[in-house]
Amino acid sequence: MNCNEAIEYIHSLEKFGMRPGLERIGELCRALGEPQKGLKIIHVAGTNGKGSTSTIISCILQKAGFNTGLFISPYVSNFRERIQYNGGMIAPEELADCVSAVKNAVENDLAPRGIQPTEFEAITAAAFVYFKRKGCDYAVLEVGLGGRFDSTNIIDAPCVGVLTSISLDHMAVLGDTVEKIAFEKCGIIKPGSEIVAYPFQDEKAFAVIRKACAEAGDRLTVPDIGKISVISESLYGTEAEYDGLRFELHLAGKHMVYNACTAIEAVRALHADISDAAIAEGIAAAVMPARLELISREPVILLDGGHNEGCAEAVADFIGRHVAGRRIVMLSSLMADKDVDGYLRRVAPFAAEFIATRADVPRAMDAEALKEAAAEYCADCRAISSPAEALEYARSRVKNGEALIVCGSFYLAGEIRDQMLDHNN
């Protein structure tokens, strides 16, 4: 099996759908020799900020000298982004080897017993195999969906459990209230862990978190809002201070400062040999594609893959403080199963011109339908179904001193980012 065959095998499991539960991943891990056992894990759940918080934690641990694994989703441009070691993507041959081990376990052990893992379960198991083989000092695991029944939750009690911002999303699976969603996220809270929570949490979510920690007998740490100060912020980065520790952050948006403070408390909760210098260096090293990513400075081109109301609020806040003085062209694709109006009413009013397109995935909303929805908030809307053609048109409509904002979907962000980088090269 080569790398492409490994990825094809993983994607072939998509037909088995998304089926929450720990039975299948448990059987798969047992067939693989329990590779998740013995790993020192930082487990990160939440609605928004999971990927960035996980990445910052991973970068800090690396700067402190620890060999660190990182498991995140979704990927933007390359499938191998999902499994990383010391800041680098898993090598193609290593992905092939780990997925081959998973495939053999499925075909020789699970399938004969009528057990069929899902796509996410298979890639989670491959990550466990990889981290075990690499001898990671720590592994940072981002939850895929929810927490309680997510395949990453097959682990024993993590060293630290982290809960990022919790809000309404994936309501068909997780529940239709913040309390129900928080309950699912709090499934990662287990006796014997340190728990850290994002500071600006919905109070209803906080109540659920506090209750879960009390029941598990775990200490809950929340960054002290009074010790957070943003010193300077621009399109190009942020300088901030938390609890006497000054740091530079290249992930855009004030919410990223709060994610960084959450990460600081998470690594402190490990009680490991991690200096303030390593923390500052790790935060400065953290980068993530398609999170208010600045692709071009002039004209400004920003790329954001967030898709729910919380993400829309972060994008709107950033636009309002750093881009609103420019004429803005917005290029967007949204998934039909998301709260489309909730997203659009926050971001579309900033657009002088709104271009609706359709990312190349079945769940994507039709471009014409998105255009009609956006017309409630922007007077100048058009639909161009092809993302490549939409990008070409959008770029023709933006000149120096103006801004193009691509937003609403990681699928679109991946397509556009690849096109932009190819164009720039």
Give names to the regions the model predicted.
Residues S409:
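Active-site-proximal loop/hinge segments that shape catalytic or ion-binding/gating pockets
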